[in-house]
Amino acid sequence: EARGRVEPFTEEQLQSFSDIYANEEIRGATPRYWEDVQVGDQLPRMMKGPMTVTGFICYAQGWGGLYIRANKLAWKMQQAHPGLGIKNRFNVPDCPERVHWDEAFALEVGAPGAYDYGPERNSWLTHHMTNWIGDDGFLHKTNCQIRRHNPDGDALFIDGTVTRRFVEDGKLLVEISQKAETHRGELSAMGTAIVELPSRAGK
């Protein structure tokens, strides 16, 4: 049984998501100078999703996954680590990571459905930052807190606010507070980042 919260998006919602993607601001080669940034400045909104199982698998393909193996490689891993596999509906030991694409297993472990990888959300917050700082900026420090699952069907919006502008050890730094919420307004992740920006004075 599905989790009981599948709400199909309207065409208008999908168009609004498309507009956010089409207008995503990527600073790139245009420097963002430290002198031009002020406390209270809002970063452009970034969107991720709507989440799909296909998207979850794409992320797993990109980073490899800890236990995702097939055929003889899966067998070899089970031989080396007999307690690793969790039996599926065919009584076959399978990897615990299948909570990200196996709806029934995700529900069995108490999740709201097949859901995204937590580390991917960390990468989304850093993506939000690198879009904003541009090629001449440097992501000095980042912190991310994962607050809930993002099951398939969720859309996520990432916003940020400049909270501090300061100089430390000769570096021109800016601190950003970030927040990622679903299309229902649920807090999914939050974080902070400290970035180094270039100066108009060329220092």
Please state what every model-predicted region is.
Residues 1-24, 29-34, 38, 150-203:
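HotDog/MaoC-like acyl-thioester-processing domains
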Residues 2-136, 200-203:
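Hot-dog-fold acyl-thioester-processing enzymes
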Residues 30, 141-147:
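Short structured motifs
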Residues 45, 139-141, 190:
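Hydrophobic residues on conserved beta-strands that form the core of alpha/beta folds
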Residues 49, 144, 193-195:
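Generic detection of short hydrophobic beta-strand segments and adjacent strand-loop junctions
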Residues 63, 82-83, 148-156:
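Short amphipathic alpha-helical patches
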Residues 133-139, 167-168:
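Phosphate-handling active-site elements
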